From Swiss-Prot:
The keyword Transmembrane helix does not apply. One of its GO terms (molecular function) is antioxidant activity. It comes from the Eukaryota. It comes from Dipetalogaster maximus (Blood-sucking bug). This is Salivary antigen-5.
Length: 249
């Protein structure tokens, strides 16, 4: 395909539970040309965690959705980064195979998973493409809110959104690769979530104004409408325990 001044760009999304593919740490398990894998640390990690928490906070405040206005959430947790979830996400991203791998954590427990693929006729590189595309990829997942009616149950058409705002999910870890597929240059984002969301018969969160204490949670210092887990802290003098809020660094 000939290049033009306005490069062609398109996106694909896929949702866990639709099907699985085998994954490994190998680079491009097909005819695609591997061009790089981004180590998501520093500003790259902060960006992907922050955009997830932005959308969670927006939803928990009752400000998400237009046609289907979403109710506020009592108990939505602030997400923090998880290295185990990220390492498994990197393995899948590096295969260059667009499909789910039935992700499980180091304890063999299932994880939730969202994947997205964006392609352009113009070459970039792994760092620049992540900077330009990652926010839009996560936004595409979240934008399924337009089709979601709270309490309607799981749907493959809105499952990216419901995983992003699943209240009990507390950890996220992502991987990103960049490769050439035919004449197209592709960025592949994989995010794994712990514990997983999208349980059949369950709503993504408890409806109501934020009430962290009601659910034995602390209030986030970074997001007005999100909660954080409490860690037990032992008092060395008395032997008693106290609870302290755990905040994202």
């Amino acid at each position: 395909m000939a290049k033009t001044q306005c490069p062609l760009v398109f996106s694909l999304l896929a949702l866990a539970l639709i099907g699985t593919l085998q994954s490994s740490a190998a680079q491009c398990q097909n005819s695609n040309q591997f061009l790089g894998s981004l180590e998501i640390t520093g500003k790259y990690r902060k960006a992907v965690v922050s955009i997830h928490n932005y959308y969670r906070n927006l939803t928990a405040a009752g400000e998400a959705g237009e046609y289907y206005k979403q109710p506020p959430a009592e108990n939505m947790l602030q997400l923090t980064w998880d290295d185990d979830a990220a390492s498994k996400a990197v393995e899948l991203a590096n295969t260059c195979v667009f499909g789910h791998d039935g992700a499980k954590d180091k304890d063999d427990k299932p994880m939730g998973q969202n994947i997205a693929l964006k392609m352009s006729s113009t070459q970039s590189d792994v760092n620049k493409s992540y900077d330009e595309w990652m926010t839009g990829m996560v936004k595409d997942w979240f934008d399924e809110v337009k089709d979601y009616s709270f309490g309607s149950g799981f749907s493959s058409g809105t499952g990216h959104y419901t995983q992003i705002v699943w209240a009990n999910t507390s950890k996220v870890g992502c991987g990103y690769s960049y490769y050439k597929e035919g004449t197209w240059y592709a960025g592949y984002l994989v995010c794994n979530y712990k514990p997983p969301g999208n349980w059949y018969g369950q709503d993504p969160y408890i409806q109501g104004n934020v009430n962290c204490e009601k659910h034995n949670l602390g209030r986030s210092k970074n997001y007005n409408n999100l909660c954080v887990t409490k860690r037990k802290k032992k008092n060395n003098k008395s032997g008693s325990t106290q609870r302290t809020n755990f905040q994202e660094k």
